[in-house]
C-alpha cells in the first residue's frame, strides 16, 4: 500500500493521467479549434490538443490534415521541433500539398539552426518558382532571403509583391520600407 501511494505521488502516474485526459479531450478541443465561432483555445488547451493529436497520429500516421494541424499548433506554441517534424511528415505523405510545404518552409526558416534556415530557403525558392503570384509564399521568401543576407533576392520578391497588391493596400508601405532597408545593406 505504501509503495502504491508513493508511486502515485512521485511516479509517472500524474503524467500518464494528464496524457489520458488530453487524449480524451482531443475531439472536443479539435472541434473548438476548427470552429471560427467558438472561443479560441488558450495555450494550455493548445498543448493538450498537441499531445492528443500526437497520440492519434501514432495510430493514424497517414493523416496529412492531422500532421498539418499539429504543425500549426507547434508554431503557435513556439515548439520548433513539433512544428518541423509534423510539417516534414505532412510533406513526406503529400509532396504536392502547398500548405504542408509552406508550413515546413516557415518552420525551417524560423529555426535557430543555420542548416534548417538554408533548407527552408531552398524549399521557398522551389515554391516561388512554381507560383510567383502567391503573396504568402513571396512574403516568407523575402523575409527568409533578408535574414540570410540575400538582399537582392529579398528585394526581387518584395517588388513582385508590390506588383500583385492593390494600390491602397496597407502592406505596400511596409514592403517599400523593407525594400529601402535591403537596398541600404
Regions found by a protein language model. Name each.
Residues 73, 107, 144, 164, ...:
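TPR/TPR-like alpha-solenoid repeats
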Amino acid at each position: 500500500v505504501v509503495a502504491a501511494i508513493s508511486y502515485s505521488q512521485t511516479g509517472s502516474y500524474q503524467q500518464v493521467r494528464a496524457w489520458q485526459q488530453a487524449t480524451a479531450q482531443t475531439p472536443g478541443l479539435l472541434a473548438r479549434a476548427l470552429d471560427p465561432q467558438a472561443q479560441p483555445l488558450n495555450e494550455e488547451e493548445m498543448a493538450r490538443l498537441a499531445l492528443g493529436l500526437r497520440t492519434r497520429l501514432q495510430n493514424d500516421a497517414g493523416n496529412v490534415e492531422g500532421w498539418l494541424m499539429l504543425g500549426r499548433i507547434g508554431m503557435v506554441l513556439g515548439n520548433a521541433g513539433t512544428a518541423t517534424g509534423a510539417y516534414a511528415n505532412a510533406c513526406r505523405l503529400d509532396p504536392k500539398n502547398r500548405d504542408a510545404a509552406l508550413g515546413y518552409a516557415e518552420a525551417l526558416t524560423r529555426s535557430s539552426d543555420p542548416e534548417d534556415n538554408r533548407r527552408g530557403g531552398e524549399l521557398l525558392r522551389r515554391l516561388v518558382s512554381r507560383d510567383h503570384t502567391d503573396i504568402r509564399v513571396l512574403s516568407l521568401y523575402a523575409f527568409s532571403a533578408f535574414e540570410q543576407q540575400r538582399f537582392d533576392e529579398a528585394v526581387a520578391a518584395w517588388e513582385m509583391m508590390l506588383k500583385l497588391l492593390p494600390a491602397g493596400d496597407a502592406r505596400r508601405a511596409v514592403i517599400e520600407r523593407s525594400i529601402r532597408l535591403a537596398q541600404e545593406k
